[in-house]
A protein has these predicted regions:
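ATP/NTP phosphate-donor binding region
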Residues: 46, 54-105
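Catalytic nucleophile loop
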Residues: 113-116, 135-159
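Glycine/threonine-rich flexible loop motifs
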Residues: 119-128
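C-terminal and late-domain segments of enzyme folds
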Residues: 20-52, 63, 68, 77-79, ...
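Hydrophobic h-region of N-terminal signal peptides that target proteins for export
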Residues: 10-18
């Protein structure tokens, strides 16, 4: 009787574990802190996006409307000639973003890059629409999601500097939600160059379950299979309130090449 009971338990436990594995995204993230995009970072993005066999989608929506070319042209630093197909996806209208026709290019996408600018513009256009769901689908099926500056911040679940009134406001009511490709995270950029490191502290104090990530310029965090690795020139600051102790620094640095397990929040060898 005991063995039969154990067998029945396994019938329930094993499928549940497999379901968890199946639901994990198969894709990758390239979260870039702004400034120079190094050869190492862009080469890795192209590789993960399948290069000549891939389809790059460029999303310039965080840019302003002053320079129309920035909303219609893929920038040269992404080396679009390395991809088999390239598309630009942009609208300011959530109603358009919620249509089947608008998301058609995303059905074959292997790589998405979000531009810099102001992150609220991207979230106002796409959050809660079919486009946002299609972005997630690209990531879940194995594509790479990349972005720099504002395009880094939108990849977190909590949106910092999302206020239309100004990017010095870290928490703005009505503009607190990112796409959540990296769950339970808040992502800042230009961290060291612009002396922004302390700006993340009140965010994590208010929302201690979040992992705070502050990335410097010319530096990126690659996320693959639950592991984060630092690429580029400088470093990434990590804020984990669950490990804060009185009198100790509120963040520590991941240096170039270091790896970090996101589930356990531990450095990897």
């Amino acid at each position: 009787m005991k063995s039969r009971t154990l067998a029945l338990l396994w019938l329930f436990v094993i499928p549940s574990a497999r379901a968890g594995e199946d639901s994990a995204p198969k894709g990758h993230l390239i979260i870039h802190g702004g400034g120079q995009l190094t050869t190492e970072v862009i080469d890795r993005f192209i590789e993960l996006g399948r290069g000549a066999e891939g389809h790059l989608i460029y999303v310039p929506t965080s840019n302003g409307d002053e320079d129309g070319k920035s909303l219609t042209t893929v920038p040269g630093y992404l080396r679009p000639e390395k991809f088999g197909k390239v598309s630009v996806l942009h609208t300011r209208d959530p109603k358009i973003a919620d249509t089947d026709g608008f998301i058609e290019p995303l059905k074959t996408a292997t790589a998405i890059w979000f531009s810099g600018g102001r992150q609220w513009r991207t979230m106002d256009a796409y959050l809660g629409t079919k486009t946002a769901a299609a972005f997630q689908a690209v990531y879940r099926r194995g594509g790479v999601i990349g972005g720099s500056s504002a395009g880094a911040t939108v990849q977190g679940s909590f949106l910092v500097r999302g206020a239309p009134a100004g990017n010095q406001i870290m928490m703005a009511e009505g503009h607190l939600e990112g796409f959540g490709f990296l769950p339970d995270s808040a992502i800042d950029q230009h961290a060291i160059v612009r002396k922004r490191l302390d700006d993340m502290i009140p965010v994590i104090e208010t929302h201690p379950h979040l992992l705070g990530i502050a990335i410097d310029e010319a530096t990126a965090l690659e996320v693959s299979g639950g592991c984060a690795r630092v690429l580029g020139k400088t470093k990434v600051a990590i804020f984990d309130a669950q490990r804060w102790k009185k009198g100790e620094p509120r963040y520590f640095f991941l240096e170039k090449g270091q790896r970090y397990a996101l589930a356990t929040r531990q450095l990897l060898p």
